[in-house]
C-alpha cells in the first residue's frame, strides 16, 4: 500500500510542477498569417487570459460571445489581455477570420494554432479551455467547458491577480 501511494505521488509531482509553468516557447500565427511567439503576450506585464476554441464548438462560441459582451466593462475595472487561440486545423482555419469579423469580435487578439503545438504544450484536452496567467506568467486558474455564468467566475479570478 505504501509503495503504491509513493508511486502515485512520484507520478503526480512532475505534473504539479507543469501545471504552474507559464507559456512555452511556441510560434503560432495571427489572423494575417504572421508568425507570433506566444510568450510575447506576457511582455506588458499584465495578466493574460487565453481561451482555446474552434469554429464548430458551440460552447466555445457561446463563451467568446459572452466575454465579448462584457469585455469593455471588464477593461474598465481590470488590466489584462484576452487572447483567443483557435485550434482549428488546416482544413478549417480559413473560417476563423470570417467568423471573428462577422461576430464583431474585434477587441481580442486572435491566434491560430493550426498544428496544435500550443494546445499540446499547454495540455489542453478539450475546448473551450480558459487559462489565466498572472503578471509573472504563472498559471493561476484553468477552466474547462462553458455554461452561462462561467465568464463571471473568470472575471472574479482576473480581479484576484490585479
Residue ranges and their predicted role:
Residues 51-57:
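Aromatic-flanked redox-active Cys/Sec active sites in thiol-based oxidoreductases
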Residues 19-21, 34:
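Boundary of Sec targeting at the N-terminus
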Residues 27-47:
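A short beta-strand-turn-helix
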Residues 14-16:
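N-terminal signal peptide c-region/cleavage motif recognized by signal peptidases
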Residues 1-4:
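Positively charged n-region of N-terminal signal peptides that target proteins for export
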Residues 99-133:
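Short, internal strand/loop/helix patches
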Residues 132-162:
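Thiol-/selenol-based redox modules, centered on thioredoxin-like
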Residues 62-103, 115-120:
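Structural microenvironment flanking redox-active thiols in thiol-disulfide oxidoreductases
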